[in-house]
A protein has these predicted regions:
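Short amphipathic alpha-helical interface segments
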Residues: 84-112
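Hydrophobic membrane-insertion alpha-helices, especially the h-region
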Residues: 16, 211-229
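Terminal peptide-recognition signature
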Residues: 25-28, 66, 251, 259-262, ...
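Functional transmembrane alpha-helices
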Residues: 2-5, 174-207, 231, 235-246, ...
């Protein structure tokens, strides 16, 4: 029973931490997209699932919600797929002429194959340009694109619900109404593309990609600052009073307890903890080290044998210190730098295996999350801050499909002055996915050996 509860505790705390941190990461992408005027159709806590609880924003059209698959979150930013469909402008115009229409009817009218029409509809659906059409009692088929589509509400300028404040709701059509485009087919498609990720310039694309990473780093930084300032930091006190004694240690067997005041070690008088530390170090290797200490106003003495490679098992007294904002910020920033340096070492062949052996998968994170939660809120939030740093910097690695990999592709395209072929981007993404699958298996195996077996 204890084992089951331990596993459930690890799963709960691990999922809670990772889901919130990934959700915040995706929240960064969502906010950046909205700032750049890019449409976002969905923003969910949890992975995509046919079962969910959601609310559709009347102001920006985005569907906000939560799914049962609490393994992170996602923001459906329009236009992230680099696919280009040549007939998309004709299909879009036809849908808005009819208001509501089926894929077979579109194919017949435009003299296109149903596959081409469906591909165009999938692209336009991902752009937030059209909506699926389901008749009363009809439900979506999981894993399949709809075969019937309808228009979105449009105002005279062509803005729709996903365009936020620019959308003139009072003078707009209703969903499924036919609507006359104010320009030509190609021009209207270009206008729709301008509201997507693909329709933005290099700087805005880079900002959207980096926003999630920035939010993770900022989250970790603020968490640590809050902990250091509010909960405080436990620091050793330079007195000769023992704070803690390890159970079963040499000191414990000699009768020394926490709270005892060390008066001398091997004849050397001690008034500070540094005196105690130095005296123990100098006496190591002797078989008859005399230790005098005081407890409840009475003096006691004992003798211990301490080999050079052994520890006495005593710790200094500690106190909680609340740091000022500047010191808290400086200390928090040092952890940011340490995490960044660790991730950079991962890219150095001579350190790759060393860093991987020190890394952990979701199993290790779950176990350590449970342990941190048991130690108290401050410890749990400190651990969450470090994981947030790691999540942010790991996403910065130049390996697709991570944000850093996507940014690398954007940089290459900017330098080359043209888009990389879709086939090349797809191959690079598959290689990146395969690499991370191998890394996940390696770290999962290490975690199983470390925490389970």
């Amino acid at each position: 029973m204890d084992t089951v509860l331990s596993v459930l505790s690890s799963v709960f705390w691990g999922l809670l931490m990772l889901s919130v941190l990934v959700f915040l990461h995706e929240g960064g992408h969502f906010l950046a997209a909205r700032v750049c005027g890019v449409r976002v159709t969905e923003f969910f806590l949890g992975l995509p699932c046919r079962f969910d609880i959601h609310h559709t924003s009347r102001r920006i059209g985005t569907k906000f919600g939560v799914t049962p698959l609490l393994l992170g979150g996602y923001a459906a930013i329009c236009g992230m797929d680099p696919t280009n469909v040549s007939c998309a402008d004709r299909v879009l115009a036809a849908i808005y002429r009819h208001g509501r229409v089926t894929v077979p009817d579109l194919a017949a009218e435009l003299e296109l194959s149903e596959e081409d029409v469906l591909e165009a509809c999938a692209l336009l659906l991902g752009w937030g340009s059209i909506a699926p059409w389901y008749e009363e009692g009809e439900k979506p088929s999981p894993g399949y694109y709809p075969t019937k589509y309808q228009t979105l509400p449009r105002d005279a300028a062509g803005f729709t619900t996903f365009d936020g404040r620019r959308f003139d709701r009072e003078h707009a059509t209703a969903e499924g109404d036919a609507w006359e485009m104010p320009c030509g087919e190609a021009e209207f498609l270009a206008q729709e593309r301008s509201h997507t990720y693909l329709g933005q310039g290099f700087l805005k694309r880079a900002f959207m990609l980096l926003a999630g990473i920035i939010v993770n780093i900022l989250t970790g930084f603020l968490l640590l600052m809050s902990i250091y300032s509010i909960a405080g930091v436990t620091v050793p006190v330079d007195t000769n009073v023992i704070g803690q004694v390890d159970e079963g240690s040499i000191a414990a067997e000699a009768g020394i307890e926490g709270g005892d005041t060390i008066l001398s070690v091997d004849g050397v008088s001690c008034s500070t903890w540094m005196d105690v530390y130095d005296a123990i170090g100098n006496a190591a290797g002797k078989d008859d080290i005399a230790i005098e200490y005081e407890r409840d106003g009475k003096q006691h003495s004992t003798t211990v044998a301490l080999k050079e490679d052994e520890r006495l098992g005593v710790y200094a007294s500690t106190q909680v210190v609340h740091l000022d904002p500047i010191t808290s910020a400086r200390l928090s920033f040092s952890y940011v730098v340490q995490t960044a340096e660790g991730v950079m070492r991962l890219l150095q062949p001579q350190h790759t295996m060393e860093i991987l052996d020190q890394s952990t998968s979701i199993v290790g994170i779950s176990v350590m999350s449970s342990q941190a939660a048991a130690a108290g809120p401050a410890t749990f939030l400190s651990f969450a801050a470090l994981i947030s740093f790691s999540l942010g910097f790991m996403n910065l690695l130049p390996i697709p499909p991570l944000d850093g990999g996507k940014l690398l592709i954007e940089i290459i395209q900017k330098i080359a002055g043209r888009e990389l072929p879709l086939k090349v981007q797809t191959i690079v993404s598959y290689v990146g996915i395969a690499l991370f699958a191998l890394l996940f298996v390696y770290m999962l195996r290490s975690d199983i050996l470390r925490f389970i077996l």
